[in-house]
Amino acid sequence: MSSPAQPEVPAPLANLKIQYTKIFINNEWHDSVSGKKFPVINPATEEVICHVEEGDKADIDKAVKAARQAFQIGSPWRTMDASERGRLLYKLADLMERDRLLLATLEATNGGKVFASSYLFDLGGCIKALKYCAGWADKVHGQTIPSDGDIFTYTRREPIGVCGQIIPWNFPLLMFIWKIGPALGCGNTVIVKPAEQTPLTALYMASLIKEAGFPPGVVNIVPGYGPTAGAAISSHMDIDKVAFTGSTQVGKLIKEAAGKSNLKRVTLELGGKSPCIVFADADLDTAVEFAHYGVFYHQGQCCVAASRLFVEESIYDEFVRRSVERAKKYVLGNPLNSGINQGPQIDKEQHDKILDLIESGKKEGAKLECGGGRWGNKGYFVQPTVFSNVTDDMRIAKEEIFGPVQQIMKFKSLDDVIKRANNTSYGLAAGVFTKDLDKAITVSSALQAGVVWVNCYMMLSAQCPFGGFKMSGNGRELGEHGIYEYTELKTVAIKISQKNS
């Protein structure tokens, strides 16, 4: 998320203490039913930060009962004024601002995110998104409809009910807010399962949710693993909607489970292999910088990463040269330290997967311009890597890498690059760089992607809908459309004695 004026970045909080490691149900802290816990790892040091209660189906069942009770007709939550729901969300945003330093430090420590980025963009984006949803709370309404006959007809936008929300590890706090903000603003109750790698900011948020004054059972947070806690949410017969951000592979399983259970509503924000097209008439400095930012931001762990870079033939060599020069300027290290540009990957599994894909690029004939291996001997660090002479059939050009790896491909014509850009099962995002307005509009209209950035990249804001085409997901988050994803539309028709226009 971007802002014209950013606050000064303080030093990270020293001597961070982990306060919350239990399951949060009914505004109270609980041990897991099984008694199990799981370790949370600092990816920069490979050391255990703490152990967290491991929720599974039994804990999800408890959370669903609490959420269903809170959603009962006549409950404090159901009878609360919509404007009061908005006030609670505004209050939560204020508490996040108060504890911004702690949350940013926790996010950087647990998720390997560069602290300055966490403080400015993650926390800044969270607070803006929460306030946006708060403002919508008393503006979600129906319409009156001039139906035929002596009938008075109107529509109602009603909350769906109990919503299961499964959060990824790459933007744990931001995705937490993207999920709960619209759900609560519309009057739903929620069960949140944070990623097992990054549960700590979600659990801290539970304490702020209670402090803000949300009634018991409205928000419940159950840390645990996908195949147990996540699967229990997807297949639960008393959950009305599931929202998931993560891989396409898991998204398919969630949609299948939703269909086999109670046909719950589903919102999915899944993987991507997003094309970024640079035409010869583009501002080269701008294009190089945004293309770099688009794939290297947060160690490449972004679903919208500009991971298929198409550069017009006449500027290809110069673009590659500048891109390599830019990548070599990166400083790797502990994300809490000042002057660091790149932190670690989230865990060993992701780290090893990235290195495997880098090796495939070397073997399949791409030219390794820089990087290409592990960095350091502690932590899950990968060198910033740039490949040139990449062809469309290589694994690095087809598979989602989710790491700091830029692959630069060459194109000759507009028609050719559009076909190549769309030749993927994904359709989350795309970028176009050109000074030609006609070309920009033509290409952005032709690209099969949920969001297209022109002469910029990864510029997100709470007011704009976000989501994917094809196998990059279903539904939208953020914006007016993202709000309505958490409502059911009801038509009410009333017989009257006489209708008058």
Curated annotation (Swiss-Prot):
GO cellular component term of the entry, any: cytosol
Gene Ontology terms describing biological process: cellular detoxification of aldehyde; fructosamine catabolic process; gamma-aminobutyric acid biosynthetic process; maintenance of lens transparency; retinoid metabolic process; retinol metabolic process
Modified residues (Phosphoserine): 413
Enzyme class: oxidoreductase
Entries under Gene3D superfamilies matching the protein: Aldehyde Dehydrogenase, Chain A, domain 1, Aldehyde Dehydrogenase, Chain A, domain 2
Residue list for modification N-acetylserine: 2
Annotated localization: Cytoplasm, Cytosol; Cell projection, Axon
CDD domains: ALDH_F1AB_F2_RALDH1
Any Pfam family hit: Aldedh
InterPro entries: Ald_DH/histidinol_DH (IPR016161), Ald_DH_C (IPR016163), Ald_DH_CS_CYS (IPR016160), Ald_DH_CS_GLU (IPR029510), Ald_DH_N (IPR016162), Aldehyde_DH_dom (IPR015590)
Descriptive protein name: Aldehyde dehydrogenase 1A1
UniProt organism field: Mesocricetus auratus (Golden hamster)
High-level lineage: Eukaryota, Metazoa, Chordata, Craniata, Vertebrata
Gene: ALDH1A1
